[in-house]
Amino acid sequence: QKLLPFFGNYIDNKGILIGNKNEGSVLKLTNDQLFSYPGYNEILTGFADDSIRSNDKIYNKNKTILELLNANKNYSGKVAAFCSWDVFPFIINDKRSGVPVSAGYSNLESKKLSKLESFIENYQTMIPLFRDNVRYDLFTHILSMEHIKNRTPKAVYISYDETDSFSHA
């Protein structure tokens, strides 16, 4: 609670966290690839796909939970994704699904950006980059929180990267 008040104050009341074995919520991936794209496909679709054998930017043929939600009349236009890694538009298949995905250093596709969103989009690439295809988690976090505050979506997927990337160093 003290270290991560957002989790304690917001997610505990309005969201869900999966993968806390102490709470009986165990998540176990079954794909045999043990790297990013196949793993995220499995997390977002609910099943492993043995045909996904790389992290290449290839549009996912599988429908994610985000796409299924966006196709539901109660969620249509109220689903979004904010991801640090620039491959997520392909994993989520933003073109087919209609789910807006802010990932990597791509700009938001909105004509009504807040001052903070415009600031982040203009300046996020002006600091030294640790990888050219991964946005710093701070920017992903700010953009996602600003979206939640201003657009009141019903479902938001947020994927940070630094704990993964920096653990490989």
What spans do the regions from the language model cover?
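Short, structured active-site-proximal loop/turn typified by the sulfatase FGly-forming signature C/S-X-P-X-R
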Residues: 2-33, 80
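Stable alpha-helical elements in mature extracytoplasmic
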Residues: 3-7, 36-40, 61-68, 75, ...
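Loop/turn elements at helix/coil->beta-strand transitions in domains of secreted/extracellular proteins
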Residues: 13-20, 72-79, 150-156
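A short aromatic-anchored loop/beta-hairpin motif
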Residues: 18-22, 32-39, 43-49
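Solvent-exposed loop/turn segments at secondary-structure junctions
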Residues: 25-28, 49-50, 85-90, 162-166
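Second-shell loop/turn segments in exported
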Residues: 28-31, 50-57, 128-134, 146, ...
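Catalytic-site neighborhoods of secreted/periplasmic enzymes
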Residues: 47-125
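Active-site His/acidic residue clusters
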Residues: 94-96, 142-169
